[in-house]
């Protein structure tokens, strides 16, 4: 069985990223490459990471006018990512364009509410209601726009799964029971997230900042 854990690679250094991924490759199901990595290493870096044989989750959280996002995704198609993220807040037309131009084997996933945000943060940017309310609303939009799923915290995934049984749900910000929270605000344990309906988990610092990343990955995997 393939592990649902995707390792978050948050470093600009390609050599360090490759070394880390090689250490844990047998205990994770894929690699999530974010803005920091992509801005430093571009297409070349993604190709190098893909040589390890793990699915690539390209987490660029694209958010712009529909035409610009569509052209950006067309430029990314040669990378053949297994998963690609866009911001749900970009609107229906942007989401529809994103899915229309993505490769047939790429899941296009909508980011709903970042796990670093809580209700006061949403109020600061003019959004009323709770993060849960916003996630449910944006999940419905993503589904209607034809996307494959959403990114949400473990606190909302149960409701999202109930409303969208066939959706693909990415849950970041998970922390082992004894793990440090850091800058995350809406967290659950990996086991709870999977029990509530997550499709895959994004795990970064609990593995990458461990003195033994492979052991950390195995310990998290053992709880699932």
UniProtKB/Swiss-Prot annotation:
Keywords: Decarboxylase, Lyase, Pyrimidine biosynthesis
GO molecular function, one term: orotidine-5'-phosphate decarboxylase activity
A Pfam family reported for this protein in Swiss-Prot or TrEMBL: OMPdecase
Record protein name field: Orotidine 5'-phosphate decarboxylase
Protein family (similarity comment): Belongs to the OMP decarboxylase family. Type 1 subfamily.
Assigned EC number: 4.1.1.23
The protein's annotated pathway: Pyrimidine metabolism; UMP biosynthesis via de novo pathway; UMP from orotate: step 2/2
Keyword Lyase: yes
InterPro entries documented for this protein: Aldolase_TIM, OMPdecase, OMPdecase_AS, OMPdecase_bac, OMPdeCOase_dom, RibuloseP-bd_barrel
Protein species of origin: Sphingopyxis alaskensis (strain DSM 13593 / LMG 18877 / RB2256) (Sphingomonas alaskensis)
Xref: SMART domains: OMPdecase
Catalytic reactions on record: orotidine 5'-phosphate + H(+) = UMP + CO2
């Amino acid at each position: 069985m393939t592990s649902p854990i995707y390792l978050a690679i948050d470093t600009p250094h390609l050599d360090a990223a490759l070394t880390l991924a090689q250490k844990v490759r047998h205990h994770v199901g894929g690699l999530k490459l974010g803005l920091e990595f992509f801005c430093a290493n571009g297409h070349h870096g993604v190709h190098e990471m893909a040589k390890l044989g793990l699915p690539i989750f390209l987490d660029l959280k694209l958010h712009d006018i529909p035409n610009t996002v569509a052209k950006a995704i067309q430029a990314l198609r040669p990378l053949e990512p297994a998963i690609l993220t866009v911001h749900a807040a970009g609107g229906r037309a942007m989401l529809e364009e994103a899915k229309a131009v993505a490769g047939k084997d790429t899941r296009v996933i909508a980011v709903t509410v970042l796990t670093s945000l809580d209700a006061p943060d949403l109020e600061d940017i003019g959004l009323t209601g709770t993060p849960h309310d916003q996630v449910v609303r944006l999940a419905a939009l993503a589904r209607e726009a034809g996307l494959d799923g959403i990114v949400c915290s473990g606190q909302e995934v149960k409701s999202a799964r109930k409303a969208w049984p066939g959706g693909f749900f990415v849950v970041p910000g998970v922390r082992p029971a004894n793990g440090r929270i850091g800058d995350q605000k809406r967290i659950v344990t990996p086991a709870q997230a999977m029990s509530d309906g997550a499709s895959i988990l994004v795990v970064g610092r609990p593995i990458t900042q461990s003195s033994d990343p492979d052991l950390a990955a195995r310990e998290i995997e053992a709880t699932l």
